[in-house]
Amino acid sequence: MGIDIRHNKDRKVRRKEPKSQDIYLRLLVKLYRFLARRTNSSFNRVVLKRLFMSRTNRPPLSMSRLIRKMKLQGRENKTAVVVGYITDDVRIHDIPKLKVCALKITSGDRSRILKSGGQIMTFDQLALAAPKGQNTVLLSGPRKAREVYRHFGKAPGTPHSRTKPYVLSKGRKFERARGRRASRGYKN
């Protein structure tokens, strides 16, 4: 008798639609599905893929990072496109004139961008203004900035490891003796 083939790892795991039931997000997906199919632009395909992503894969972009990225050469008068949130940064005082398109912008940011003579667009307005993504700069927030990434990597306690251990407390008796000082076993 032959052995039946395992089919449990056959499928390619990727999102074909957003997990969220948000009707406004799903309307955007409908729109960008159409644009991705009918235009030959990779911009629309990337935006569609990012609309499907989970929240951890759509990290927020701070105002300071947005300004820094838009100050680069050749990016003046272009629209910054963020498939995610833009959050305010109170450390920044003067905001240059920006043209921004994002899923959500905090109220503080919104008022500051408009005050500096900038413009804020939604994705359906962007689809009318730039159906192929012309004169746009696609930006995204730092994915690895989440605290959880500090715990990943080489095991804590091994030589040259900078990985944060999962400990109950940060006291004197926790992760401070064996392997940390020569008098207690060894020192890495």
UniProtKB/Swiss-Prot annotation:
Biased composition (Basic residues): 178-188
One Gene Ontology term from the biological process aspect of the record: cytoplasmic translation
Lineage, opening ranks: Eukaryota, Metazoa, Chordata, Craniata, Vertebrata
Main location (coarse class): cytoplasm
Assigned protein family: Belongs to the eukaryotic ribosomal protein eL18 family.
Subunit structure of this chain's protein: Component of the large ribosomal subunit.
Superkingdom: Eukaryota
Keyword RNA-binding attributed: no
Region (Disordered): 153-188
Stated role: Component of the large ribosomal subunit. The ribosome is a large ribonucleoprotein complex responsible for the synthesis of proteins in the cell.
Protein's name in the database: Large ribosomal subunit protein eL18B
Molecular functions per Gene Ontology: RNA binding; structural constituent of ribosome
Keywords for this protein: Cytoplasm, Endoplasmic reticulum, Ribonucleoprotein, Ribosomal protein
Paired cysteines (S-S): none
